[in-house]
Amino acid sequence: MTNYIKRFSILFFIVSSGLFANEGENLKDDIKNEESKDKEVFIEELVEDYEEIPGFFITYRDPKTNKIFLKINQNQLGKEFIYFAHVLDSVVTTGNVRGSYADKGIFKIEKDFENLRFTRVLTNYVFDEESPLKRSKGANTSDSTFKVIPIKGKNKEKNNFLIDITSLLLSESLTPILPIFSPEDFSPSRFAWGQVSPTKSRVLDVHNYEENTDFEVEYVIESAPSYEYDGEDAADPRNVSVHMRYSFIDMPNNDFEPRIENQSIGYFSDRITNLTSKEITPYEDLISKWHLKKQDPEAKFSKPVKPIVFWIENTTPLELRDYIKEGVLAWNIAFKEAGFIDAIEVKIQPDDAEWDAGDIRYNVLRWTSSPDPLFGGYGPRLSNPRTGEILGADIMLEWVYLTNRINYDSIFNAESSPASCHSSNLIQDGIILAENIQLNDPKIIEQSIKRLALHEVGHTLGLNHNFKGSYLHNNEDVHNPDITSKVGVTASVMEYPAINLAPLGVEQGDYYDTTPGPYDIWAIKYGYTPNLTASDLDEIIAEQNRPEHMFANDSEDMRSPGRGVDPRAMINDLTNDPITYAAQRIELINYNQANVVSKLSGNVKTFEEYRLALSIFMREYSRSLEVVSRHIGGVYVERYDPKNLNDKMPYSPAPPEEQRRAMGILHKHAFSTEAFPVNPDLLMRAQVERRMFDLYGEHEDPQIHKTILSIQNRVLDHVLSPWTLYRISDTELYGNDYSVNEVMNDLTKSIFTGDKDNKVSSIRRNLQTAYVRRLIDILGQDYYDELATAAAYNSLREIQKIVRRSSSDVSTKSHRKLVSWIIESGLDRAN
């Protein structure tokens, strides 16, 4: 019994000791928690050693680690802000170049327990406020949360939150930095970019203003060693920097008047669909435009309360500043039609200015000189996705496009992205062409600079390209400066026209537009006239049927073979008879090519000037042929409101007689024995200037056969495109009588007949072989229809008869045997 009592006592002691011990530990924890509450570190203490940068979002920088912190106020939670990213600097191969706009959107910050969530808001859809369907808002759509950041500290009132945004800024959470290529763009020889380095990348600066907070960031892309990077714009391609500037902007709260886009007028717009509308086209896309208000709302014409101010950057060459200023201010002609006097002002950035062009509060015309720029002019704008209000704009201009420096690789690569603006590229080509036909006219530079400024400022006003603007004049009026100086060379400075060179025997007129055209004035009137009623807008839109108001943008143009349908929506053309204009341009080129050696003799400093002359002549020749070719299989497109009377249908075939006339020009200047007259004196002088070992692995001689065949192939790429041939067959059902069979018969006759003395020239031998291979391909490809296949088969049989003809010329005999073999073996494979 005694032992039992002892054991129980010991057990009781142990248990009770443990209980008392646990109670003691809990007591200690409670004391610690109380002390912890008393010692809670608030924002004021956390940032006491940091640099404070006051402004829209109060920002702090840790001077020891360069970490960046934001203080978010309770009132800023759930509110929408505008996000904007643009490139301060990089190398061309990254796809990010100085001044280019990278990204924009709406974002909001929300508190989620002890984290703040950054979410990009979808703005593509709206609902009528009174509709019950509005309750379904957000169904089957998604906002995008791009970052979740822990709260580092709070103030005593718990309504301010401190977060470390360094990882947000140094990652690709905000905007992709690395180039993104589509599968079609993949090439084994393309430089393989690595990843953004989190250790080498850094925040360069913070700029804080009353309505926006900006961050400058340098991203360093680390890549593996590679031979594929052959540019000279990076000291070491293993470590390439991309400098970005991000802006967090307060959502404007003003009386801005949004305007819905009309398909007949080319504005950039923010895409919005009304999900409660019963319309077949429930689109409410909002055009991009500036917030202009009249000082006197009752006056017909009034100065604006706040004009649009453009600053000419202090990097701009002095000799160009007046031309640029005049070009920009010329837009006031159009704004007067909208009721505004001096809507645009131009100022010069002082050399000692404390602000820089990266500050979105300033709209700047900037000049740079880059080694290999993507474009020569670029006019991006930042707009509010909720309203379309333009908040800022810059214009990037490249010095290279006013020089004779030219990228030879691009001579016969005319493919381009609609996202890019190549107006200045064409202006550069025009200047060089004019120089090589010895037009020593100072008016060329003056008018080209004014037009470049007009074009790029047009983009910053919200206008996109208009590739039907070239149809304003006939072939006589376009060379009459009494007419063109008043209304322009084209209907729109947003065109990509050919330089207006007078044909042989005609006195030279204006080279380029120096004033907004009638389309531009109409577009500004629609977009900027304040306080318009629905009937007022309808009245303006009703002018869409005027020929000077024709419009087509980049999605409709025919610059690339097989793309687009309306031959009037084309680049490098001019006048309402572009076929004749192009033929006259080719005759002008042929004349000057024959005489260029004697003209340049004694004035050249390097034989590369002859090379440049040859290249620009051949490029202009190619462009003229492409303009002509687009009329074959063309369909005229008219876009108008059905309630506005119009005697034209939305779709009508290009007149068959115009298509046949175009084929006749192609026969003469692309395929016949007369095409491509070669100047041997020019070829012998067209030498590339050697630079160190750059000629290693290159064929430096002017490969004229290859060049000519590439031009001919670009014409055939279009005429024999499956889309062109489909369209020819389809339009036979509604007015076209120029059939696929007739088109191919005309091509075959042009390419295979007419050789002098039954001797086929080397240029024509190349062409004939390439053409036959194309016809064989048509037989073997599923994407050609049976109508095209039958026409191709018939042409091959006709060619077989032609090549059986005897010839005393050895080269012709060999060539015809080859062609015969290609046809026989090709037909065997196609069976």
Regions found by a protein language model. Give the residues of each.
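Sec-exported extracytoplasmic/periplasmic mature domains
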Residues: L329-F340, G458-H459, L463, I499, ...
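Extended catalytic-interface subdomain
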Residues: E389-N407, A453, V457-G458, P503-L504, ...
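Conserved catalytic/binding loops enriched for acidic/polar residues
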Residues: I444, S470-N831
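The catalytic-center signature of Zn2+-dependent metalloproteases
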Residues: I348-S370, L374, Q447-P503
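Divalent metal-coordination and catalytic microenvironments
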Residues: L70, W331, G388, H455, ...
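Hydrophobic h-region of N-terminal signal peptides that target proteins for export
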Residues: F12-A21
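Auxiliary tRNA-acceptor-end handling modules of aminoacyl-tRNA synthetases
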Residues: E25-T316, A334, A338, Q349-N440, ...
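Bacterial N-terminal signal peptides that target proteins for export
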Residues: M1-S9
